[in-house]
Amino acid sequence: MAYSYTEKKRIRKDFSKLPDVMDVPYLLAIQLDSYREFLQAGASKDQFRDVGLHAAFKSVFPIISYSGNAALEYVGYRLGEPAFDVKECVLRGVTFAVPLRVKVRLIIFDKESSNKAIKDIKEQEVYMGEIPLMTENGTFVINGTERVIVSQLHRSPGVFFDHDRGKTHSSGKLLYSARIIPYRGSWLDFEFDPKDCVFVRIDRRRKLPASVLLRALGYSTEEVLNTFYTTNVFHLSGEKLSLELVPQRLRGEVAVMDIHDGSGKVIVEQGRRITARHINQLEKAGVKELDVPLEYVLGRTTAKAIVHPATGEILAECNTELTTDLLVKIAKAQVVRIETLYTNDIDCGPFISDTLKIDTTSNQLEALVEIYRMMRPGEPPTKDAAETLFNNLFFSAERYDLSAVGRMKFNRRIGRTEIEGSGVLSKEDIVEVLKTLVDIRNGKGIVDDIDHLGNRRVRCVGEMAENQFRVGLVRVERAVKERLSMAESEGLMPQDLINAKPVAAAVKEFFGSSQLSQFMGQNNPLSEITHKRRVSALGPGGLTRERAGFEVRDVHPTHYGRVCPIETPEGPNIGLINSLAAYARTNQYGFLESPYRVVKEGVVSDDIVFLSAIEEADHVIAQASAAMNEKKQLIDELVAVRHLNEFTVKAPEDVTLMDVSPKQVVSVAASLIPFLEHDDANRALMGSNMQRQAVPTLRADKPLVGTGMERNVARDSGVCVVARRGGVIDSVDASRIVVRVADDEVETGEAGVDIYNLTKYTRSNQNTCINQRPLVSKGDVVARGDIMADGPSTDMGELALGQNMRIAFMAWNGFNFEDSICLSERVVQEDRFTTIHIQELTCVARDTKLGPEEITADIPNVGEAALNKLDEAGIVYVGAEVGAGDILVGKVTPKGETQLTPEEKLLRAIFGEKASDVKDTSLRVPTGTKGTVIDVQVFTRDGVERDSRALAIEKMQLDEIRKDLNEEFRIVEGATFERLRAALNGQVVDGGAGLKKGTVITDDVLNGLEHGQWFKLRMAEDALNEQLEKAQQYIVDRRRLLDDKFEDKKRKLQQGDDLAPGVLKIVKVYLAIRRRIQPGDKMAGRHGNKGVVSVIMPVEDMPHDANGTPVDVVLNPLGVPSRMNVGQILETHLGLAAKGLGEKIDRMIEEQRKAAELRTFLTEIYNEIGGRQENLEEFTDEEIMALANNLKKGVPMATPVFDGAKEREIKAMLKLADLPESGQMQLFDGRTGNKFERSVTVGYMYMLKLNHLVDDKMHARSTGSYSLVTQQPLGGKAQFGGQRFGEMEVWALEAYGAAYTLQEMLTVKSDDVNGRTKMYKNIVDGDHRMEPGMPESFNVLIKEIRSLGIDIDLETE
């Protein structure tokens, strides 16, 4: 296998046994693909596919005026260029977006002509607002902050059949219902009531009998009965009644008389129940008619109206119950044929017939009116209004759309074969749904499982943005329609008709404040990736936390390979917010698909198919770990498989598919937990959630025990710098990498230079630090896709969230009681868990009513000492160390409380005494913060003079840009001259540049000429002269292009900033705060084993082994058995082996062993103990030495999820490292030197420091703000609040009889306003007495009682 630049430097020993059939797909594809589809940015107008923006425009246009004399058609759209790049947008606090220009055509028809002749056509491009662009990492920059649009898992449009699980009626009877859910439009529900009549609801309003809807559709009672029922035909002749016999229909009935065959033999005796055997005999005997007594027909329902043969009078309407009187009447009239409905209690209930009986309407108009009354109660119905309303409900494409998905699901559910069709409902659709519902009630067919992933689909960014855009366009449409009628008379252009504000507002609202547009979690690369791959059931059109029951949240069999069963938040959102599985993707309909290998007749092929939950149901799917031989045949007699959403076993020849990888079940975060298969699910959930909260440490340290997914996450997250094209590193420093691109990757006419500017010490959304460090050195050769620089939490291109710590599992002096963690001081000294946090503090100078605020170093009543870190503009220097309360930006605000007399005004004007009329409103460092100023940004409004600091910053930025462009030019020029040198060498000169005719060009000759003179050479060959001219022209063009680029950037920098109204200047100061680990910080492993640091002990007191090596962390062994996360123990053992092997390699290098010996030892590590074979033969000796040097701190191992290291392999590794195979060793107490009485598990575990730091939570209050009504101190750190002294705490003091302490708590320390002021004064005077008064809460109580209308007063004696 080929190794990338970074992989070669440090290979992970991989324990996986199963082959890699398929690489993990690009992890951010779900976001990027969806939005690319929405914008279709590169497409020309004939290439537009009917999706995204294009589809939204087509669904609203053409807009036709009310009179029909003018129409506005849509032609196409184009996207402009963004004004700023992503970094500039973040800095300036603006949205990263492009202008959208739509080409529309206004057509005006001739009123006079009868055939709508076209009178005038105008085409014009109209600006339709800005559309946010997605960055290459799948985020949006909205108002300067990075946001992610989370995908939504919602109920797919279509038709669903369900029952109430017996909860509605006290009898526990199942009431069935059907619901047609469109993509947009009214919902249509059919439901049974306890009396078995069918009702319909539109948009969950009051219910009507379902027959009302059928009548409104134009069906008569007879047509309805014909559609839903078959009939029994009776012949009447005199007193005799005979039935046309269909034997099957008699099954289960009790014979009312003896039934004979043709020969008079009795087949069924009277009073016996008719069984299948009897029916067979009847069919054999060929009985076609059966004489029945008259009572047999009583109580049956007529299927057609019964008409008097002579007079034509209707004796009985259809759907009438036959009674004795009616039968007499019919017999008198000599009717010979009666048709009745065939119903029974088993599989053909009389539900529709009963519904028709309770229906009060009798024709279509009455039904329409009834529906109108239900939808618009209180409005007088007219025929037209009722018809229009009904048609608009389900049959108008403007108001109703099932969408392609909905139509496909609808047709499949009601048993049609075609999957395409109209977006609106038809009569047949509604009847088919009712038929299916009645069938289910009759016991044919089953209800749907709403939590099945075949019934829930994912709405991604693109689709949601399209919906919002359509909403905006519909708002525009109304306004355009009204203006269109004026278009002709006033000669308006399309520009005048369309107001883009509603569209822009709808888009802005969606990206800025939708529930699914979220502030991106940016603690570390994993939290970014997970956030982008999140799937939420909440949000507009989704569920709400309160209403979501247990079933929706639970893991469903169809989640397998689509949604992770482990990763979901704890708390109220559990199960509603999920994560995509590692290999999952969405199909064209938005259903989640998982990949499978195709299996034919027990042989596994390498073909891969992606299947949705519906398609997979009928397949027999083997596990990825199913045993195979070399010919890829399944060899077990019975293979463990999934079939029909159940786990079972089948013979190999029955298997049709096989999983591609064991980790396809879990999400990215869960697949980063080694030995996940040995952890309890609850703890694995915590483990995957806590990895997202890890803070990037100062020096990232790769996990010794990983899973092999680390590299994928680091690469796909976008925090590393990945080579866009291969080439040679031309120059590299801390802030940029310049690559001279390989010739075969340079397209003609473009520069063969890639410049990568690294991000240095930038603030993330969570205030952690984003910093990139180069991995390459000058002259290195890199290929496309190689990682050239590490980002936060990455180490040599691998995700590195924490640090490898030497841990011991032992109880130790109670310091690790209840999940506490005991740390060694060495961890602090080596800065293992030191993190950098960057805080952005902003100072805004506004224009106030009393005059403008000013940013200045001239602040009233502030000593020199406080100003020594400010420059002359009043802004702090970069590099200054500042603490709480220090001034960062000096700002004064005019104050105008005092009214000045005219005399005073005059004196002010003459002597300019300014200090008294401004107040100090400087930006100061908040309490509890100290750090270093690492950057300052100044933004000035257009037209306001820029201060010296702003100009200095601008100059610095311009120098950076110029440096980049010059570098690019230098390399382009160098490459051009290199090519010329190769072409000219050994050629003959014709003159020019001071050379004689006939001179042969050599390197020396060329070195003697300046570059400018090369172009003056006239060569003997014309082709060479042409090449020289082209090269000269190319260099001139390139220079001009770069100069234009520079001017463009300069213009952007020098134009004023677009600030909010009333803001003159904004200064942003960035503070870097260094936080060491300290007691109170939260730490965790990757297995949900979390704890708080309780104590940091001196190194010499920590337990140590026989060699004197102390442990770094002591964990409590009691935290393991009850929580069942044994993975941490296995990780500890394997970590010990990894470290031991590293130390062994280190000793070999120190002893200066030969490369061959190292190669042998490395081969033993990588290729002799289980897992994947590494190809070390292709490495040169230098590469082997480089590899060995990178392994000195430990050989990193990968134990993939569900396919990891076995116990025997861990033991073999420990043995190879010359360590005890038990993984336990004898420890000594550092304080006494005594042995502990039994050996202790010691090893290396990967520990994370979580973003729950004691510094952010700890807080102390002296005096501060008070609540307005109760006059009690506020609560919480943000409000600088006090400590709550609640009811139970009062009881505690009462119990101790501490009366004076209690009095103090309830009065002067709380809400006794006068008492606390007095006390403050007393303390200032050195007098520590207190005089409690009346607490304010007493006055509040009195006011509350008075508000009840009771007059109450406090009487004082």
From Swiss-Prot:
It comes from the Bacteria. GO terms for biological process: DNA-templated transcription. PANTHER family: DNA-DIRECTED RNA POLYMERASE I SUBUNIT 2. Keywords: DNA-directed RNA polymerase, Nucleotidyltransferase, Transcription, Transferase. Its EC number is 2.7.7.6. This is DNA-directed RNA polymerase subunit beta. DNA-dependent RNA polymerase catalyzes the transcription of DNA into RNA using the four ribonucleoside triphosphates as substrates. The RNAP catalytic core consists of 2 alpha, 1 beta, 1 beta' and 1 omega subunit. When a sigma factor is associated with the core the holoenzyme is formed, which can initiate transcription. InterPro entries: DNA-dir_RNA_pol_bsu_ext_1_sf (IPR042107), DNA-dir_RNA_pol_bsu_external_1 (IPR019462), DNA-dir_RNA_pol_su2 (IPR015712), DNA-dir_RNAP_su2_dom (IPR007120), DNA-dir_RNAP_su2_hyb_sf (IPR037033), RNA_pol_bsu_bac (IPR010243), RNA_pol_bsu_CS (IPR007121), RNA_pol_bsu_protrusion (IPR007644). HAMAP family: RNApol_bact_RpoB (MF_01321). It catalyses: RNA(n) + a ribonucleoside 5'-triphosphate = RNA(n+1) + diphosphate. It is an enzyme of class 2 (transferase). PROSITE patterns: RNA_POL_BETA. Belongs to the RNA polymerase beta chain family. GO terms for molecular function: DNA binding; DNA-directed RNA polymerase activity; ribonucleoside binding. One of its GO terms (cellular component) is DNA-directed RNA polymerase complex. Pfam families: RNA_pol_Rpb2_1 (PF04563), RNA_pol_Rpb2_2 (PF04561), RNA_pol_Rpb2_3 (PF04565), RNA_pol_Rpb2_45 (PF10385), RNA_pol_Rpb2_6 (PF00562), RNA_pol_Rpb2_7 (PF04560).
